[in-house]
Curated annotation (Swiss-Prot):
It comes from Aspergillus fumigatus (strain ATCC MYA-4609 / CBS 101355 / FGSC A1100 / Af293). The alpha and beta chains are autoproteolytically processed from a single precursor protein within the mitochondrion. Keywords: Acyltransferase, Amino-acid biosynthesis, Arginine biosynthesis, Autocatalytic cleavage, Mitochondrion, Multifunctional enzyme, Transferase. This is Arginine biosynthesis bifunctional protein ArgJ, mitochondrial. This protein may be expected to contain an N-terminal transit peptide but none has been predicted. Belongs to the ArgJ family. Pfam families: ArgJ. The record marks T155, G156 as: Involved in the stabilization of negative charge on the oxyanion by the formation of the oxyanion hole. The lineage of its organism: Eukaryota, Fungi, Dikarya, Ascomycota, Pezizomycotina.
Amino acid sequence: MVSPAQPAAAMAAFARMAKGQVRNYSAPLDMAIPASKQKYIPSSGSYPKGFLVSGTHVGVKASNTKFPDLALISSETPCSAAAVFTTNKFQAAPVQVSKKTLESRQGQGIRSVVINSGCANAVTGKGGLEDAVNMGKKVDECNGLSEPSTIVMSTGVIGQRLPISKILNKIPTAHENLASTHDAWLTTARAICTTDTFPKLLSRTFALPSSPGRTYSLAGMTKGAGMIHPNMATLLGVLCTDAPIDPSALQSLLTHAVSRSFNSISVDGDTSTNDTVAILANGAAGGAPISSPASDDYTAMQEILTSFAQSLSQLVVRDGEGATKFVTVRVQNSPDYESARLIASTIARSPLVKTALYGRDANWGRILCAIGYTQGVAPGTVVPERTSVSFKPVDGSPVLKLLVNGEPEQVDEERASVILQEEDLEIVVDLGGGEKGEQGLGGEEAVYWFCDFSHEYVTINGDYRT
């Protein structure tokens, strides 16, 4: 019990926690997954050949006394590898080290990814860089390698040094515990969580045109719930496949996939120092390597990887801090893709749009305002007289038109309220600027996924370091 003598702040924090409103920063007291999130936890998986994973307890954050906070993903054979990193100028030590490793190896011969949660190892000076290097070296030693062959990632509070001795001492244990089971993959996904309420893990099988009878697998895990507005935000992602893909092709495939997935989500508009999405391809399932962008296999792989990355990144939005809504914003009939993407991004970042959705208020004027102040769009993209906005219900019922060709509709507020009570919602913005200059015909389309802003978001982030 909390005694009356304790500070009022502590009493308030306890009260909020008792109401289930506070997500502990790292390693929640019981790691319990909310009932509403259980549906996103896979009960089984189809994992790529030759990959082994483990989640191990280190206690990076002192308050974490038993839950896994060190993840290790390893391939039994060398991999092609590629990654996309944060655009934040204060790039964390592991980002700098991993970039250097991939550049020096030219995306070849990578064997492992090691990740700690509980401390970001960002803005930690030369010592932080040494810590990141030593994490990679320790994994390489366990793999019997002398050259840098490990991608390093960290997530947590910025500006604090890692308890590096504790981590280095536990890496051999993590290596000994490597396994290929579904439980091992799920535990590893848990190990990278911070304010996440559930581990984010997906897997699937696929075939390629050149080998229709051969089955390949693709698996991925990600973390993130706040500081999410990538180019990249606090999110980490690791994808693994047993398909054979050359490094240069792998980088272009990942870059395309990330631009339409992890870089098309927003929780709060902040971009972190640590964001990294990496992919490893070991070719263990055999077949001809994917190398040329002109090949049918490349085209198929691009579609498969992009779709998979979208599904994985959407789990981050569904776990947005304090979120009650999962919102898709679709901007269509734009003269070019980039303009559509900028408009979708601006809507997704707008606090006024996000709070209106939380309040179940069909305040389409806020959406229109965001469209109108979007910076960087091509001239003539936004023309009020041909702009339309509508809500698309998830139940398949007719769209609710809010604005048509710049003219407001008589909105059925009761129906709008019913639509906004659902967890999922799609906002459709039609710019009417397609190739034929008519509504719904031609033009480019961009899609963004975001969540609403609730009271809980402020509570979570107000208590983040406490």
